[in-house]
Structure formats: structure tokens, C-alpha cells
């Protein structure tokens, strides 16, 4: 098979991947946990220790000062701030994509989402220089 045949197969493969959706591309090109270095005021409780402990094909990643289940297809910095259902009172930071800034919010101490940082510096380090579509 000549180079034009290989090129045709490559184009067909790319089109097939686009039609099949993310499932096939995730299998071929698995996403990895983020590698963001942060200075933590304290180590947070780990939510998981292995990928299989995470629901819905999420991955167990070191993120925001502890191990957390992350959906690698969803950008943490695009999530809204979520207080969670518990009634503790922790001042935390979240990234506001609309205003391109980090702001404080009160976290109840459980659940919520991963757009939840110990400090403004960690929030900015994770989200500020991202390019959003």
C-alpha cells in the first residue's frame, strides 16, 4: 500500500473517530489526571484511592490537596460553585469563568463539586491561564 493509501486510511480513521464520539477516542487516547502542583494549607481527606472507587467512569486523581474523583471530560474550572448539603462553614475559593476570576464562597464541608480550592492562589494556578472556547 502506497503513501496515498495510508493517507486515505488515516483520513477515514479520523472521520470515524469524529462520528463515533468520545468513547472511541477515550479508548485510543486515554485522558490523564491533571498534574498541577499546589501548596496546600492542609491535606484534605481523600475521597478515593483507586479509579474503581469512583462512579461514572471518573478517575481517582491527586487534585486540590487530596485524592478526588474527577470526570476528565469536564473542566473543573467551568463548574458552578456548590455549597453542598452539609452545614459546616468553610471559606473556600471557586473559579468564575464568566468573570475570569476566583471568588470566595461558603462550603458546607461535604459533596459539592471540584471547583473548590483552599486558597485564591490554588484557584488561580489551576484555572486562570486556561483558554476557554
Curated annotation (Swiss-Prot):
Compartment annotation: Secreted
A molecular-function term among this protein's GO annotations: serine-type endopeptidase inhibitor activity
Leader sequence residues: 1-21
Interaction with LTF: annotated span: 117-133
PROSITE patterns: BPTI_KUNITZ_1, BPTI_KUNITZ_2, WAP
Segments for region (Interaction with SEMG1): 102-133
Pfam families to which the protein is assigned, alphabetical: Kunitz_BPTI, WAP
GO biological process, alphabetically ordered: defense response to bacterium; negative regulation of flagellated sperm motility; negative regulation of peptidase activity
Stretches assigned to the BPTI/Kunitz inhibitor domain: 77-127
SUPFAM superfamilies in alphabetical order: BPTI-like, Elafin-like
Coiled-coil residue spans: none
S-S pairs: 33-61, 40-65, 48-60, 54-69, 77-127, 86-110, 102-123
Keywords: Antimicrobial, Disulfide bond, Protease inhibitor, Secreted, Serine protease inhibitor, Signal
Membrane-spanning parts: none
Domain WAP, chain residue ranges per copy: 26-73
One GO location term (cellular component): extracellular space
UniProt function note: Serine protease inhibitor that plays an essential role in male reproduction and fertility. Modulates the hydrolysis of SEMG1 by KLK3/PSA (a serine protease), provides antimicrobial protection for spermatozoa in the ejaculate coagulum, and binds SEMG1 thereby inhibiting sperm motility.
Subunit structure: Monomer. Homodimer. Homomultimers. Interacts with SEMG1 (via 164-283 AA). Interacts with LTF. Found in a complex with LTF, CLU, EPPIN and SEMG1.
Protein name: Eppin
Amino acid at each position: 500500500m502506497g503513501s496515498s493509501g495510508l493517507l486515505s486510511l488515516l483520513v477515514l480513521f479520523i472521520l470515524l473517530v469524529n462520528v463515533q464520539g468520545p468513547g472511541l477516542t477515550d479508548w485510543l487516547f486515554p485522558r490523564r489526571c491533571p498534574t498541577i502542583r499546589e501548596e496546600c494549607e492542609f491535606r484534605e481527606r481523600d475521597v478515593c484511592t483507586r479509579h474503581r472507587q469512583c462512579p461514572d467512569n471518573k478517575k481517582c486523581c491527586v487534585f486540590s490537596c487530596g485524592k478526588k474523583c474527577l470526570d476528565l471530560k469536564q473542566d473543573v474550572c467551568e463548574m458552578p460553585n456548590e455549597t453542598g448539603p452539609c452545614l459546616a462553614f468553610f471559606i473556600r475559593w471557586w473559579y468564575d469563568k464568566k468573570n475570569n476570576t476566583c471568588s470566595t464562597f461558603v462550603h458546607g464541608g461535604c459533596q459539592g463539586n471540584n471547583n473548590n480550592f483552599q486558597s485564591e492562589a490554588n484557584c488561580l494556578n489551576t484555572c486562570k491561564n486556561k483558554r476557554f472556547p
